[in-house]
Amino acid sequence: MGGGVYDTGMIRAVIDTNVFIAALRSSSGASFQIFMAADRGDFEVALSVPLLAEYDDVSARPDIGITIPPASIDAIIGRIAQIAHKQPIYFLWRPILPDPKDDMVLELGIAAGVSHIVTFNCKDFTQAAEFGITINSPSEFLTLIL
């Protein structure tokens, strides 16, 4: 199993914000299990400052349906930042995807040399294949890494 352009022998993936939010909403779904697998070192999460900021921003919205206390969310985000491959972004590919907010996810994937992007919006990432990146739903990706 390749890990992308910068092959470490392990799968490297970008986890979209919608998957992070799903993991915070429920501990019984594939999204939560993906973050548990990352914490165990089963694969490597690629992270950028903009994506980390989006995790923080979206998880703090009162209408998002998360019942975890803000301090716990901060600790979770801190842990993700601790275990992740931190990737600076030097080149912007915008606009490339139908939803401009998804561009930063693909840009991170390209810069970090990931093999996978995990998202609930698979149809919005059709151009990822041009960069050798596979788009997976959380359940598809979980099957791949376990």
Model-derived segments and spans:
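Amphipathic coiled-coil/heptad-repeat helices and related helical stalk/stem segments
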Residues: A30-S31, I73, K101-D102
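Acidic, PIN/NYN-like endoribonuclease modules and their adjacent C-terminal/linker elements
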Residues: G2, I96, I110-H116, C122-L146
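Short, active-site-adjacent cap segments at secondary-structure transitions
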Residues: F20-I21, L52-E54, D124-T126
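Active-site neighborhoods of divalent-metal-dependent phosphate/nucleic-acid chemistry enzymes
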Residues: Q82-C122
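Residues that scaffold the ATP/ADP-binding catalytic core of kinase and kinase-like folds
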Residues: A23-L24, V58, T67, A128, ...
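Short, well-structured N-terminal submotif of metal-dependent ribonuclease cores
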Residues: M1-L47
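PIN-domain endoribonuclease scaffold, especially VapC-family toxins
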Residues: A37-L92
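Short secondary-structure boundary segments
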Residues: T17, V49-P50, F120-C122
